């Protein structure tokens, strides 16, 4: 597929990001998905709009595909470039040894996410077993990543990227991503600008653990207003305001107020 020049920079960044996150084949999946989104964009007057839908999707589909999970966090913590950067920032001199202490607080739902889909679902379907395991896992730990034991442990976790596609977390990420893209595509023929904002709303989902859960909740709440906004010419502006309200207030009070306003339009 020949992508419009305006999307090239974002697509290049997306391919680079996803190759680093997983592998070249995963970046290929991204380009295949983007080709389908570009076709929908063309069919709905995207050229006259500067292919804004494709450009936004090039950025946020890559962000969605490169989600933060246990494997990603472990991978980033054992990279040589990270140790080199910290050494330079701290100013370690020749002959000195630097040990880094990381705070980690894993939860059982994150552990289940790294497991094969079937096993993860099997554990989640047994509340007593899940709670038993969570009591043993859900603890704050200060980890010295420069020691052989912890470096090896994190290195092993980072190597699980090879089986990431079969994990429960990956299954759920794909499911959520496709639901989001389906919503954007369903809006596209009727309200192009609103569809672009649906894509851009993905910026609310970021981070890891509790941060990710809060972002996901805000994302779902903001997009719940799309059916009300779709018939409106200013629907895109209102969705943008909802997203900004979600970004500026961690407590969600501003978003609650904005959603109530939209409901009265």
Q: Can you annotate each of these PLM segments?
A:
Residues 1-265:
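Active-site loops and adjacent core secondary-structure elements that bind or stabilize anionic groups
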């Amino acid at each position: 597929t020949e992508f419009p020049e305006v999307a090239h920079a974002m697509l290049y960044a997306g391919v680079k990001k996803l190759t680093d996150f997983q592998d070249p084949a995963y970046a290929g999946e991204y380009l295949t998905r983007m080709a389908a989104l570009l076709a929908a964009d063309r069919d709905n007057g995207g050229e006259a709009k500067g292919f804004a839908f494709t450009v936004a999707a090039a950025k946020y589909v890559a962000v969605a595909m490169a989600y933060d999970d246990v494997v990603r966090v472990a991978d980033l913590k054992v990279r040589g470039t990270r140790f080199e950067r910290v050494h330079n920032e701290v100013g370690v001199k020749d002959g000195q040894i630097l040990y880094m202490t990381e705070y980690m607080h894993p939860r059982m739902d994150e552990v289940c996410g790294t497991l094969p889909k079937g096993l993860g679902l099997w554990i989640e379907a047994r509340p007593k077993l899940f709670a038993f395991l969570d009591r043993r896992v859900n603890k704050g730990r200060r980890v010295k990543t420069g020691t052989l034991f912890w470096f090896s442990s994190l290195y092993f976790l980072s190597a699980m990227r090879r089986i990431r596609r079969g994990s429960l977390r990956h299954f759920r990420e794909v499911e959520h991503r496709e639901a989001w893209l389906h919503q954007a595509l369903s809006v596209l023929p009727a309200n192009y600008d609103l569809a672009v904002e649906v894509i851009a709303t993905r910026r609310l989902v970021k981070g890891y653990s509790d941060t990710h859960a809060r972002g996901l909740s805000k994302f779902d709440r903001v997009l719940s207003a799309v059916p009300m906004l779709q018939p409106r010419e200013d629907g895109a502006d209102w969705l943008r305001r909802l997203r900004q309200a979600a970004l500026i207030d961690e407590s969600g009070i501003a978003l609650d107020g904005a959603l109530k306003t939209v409901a009265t339009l």
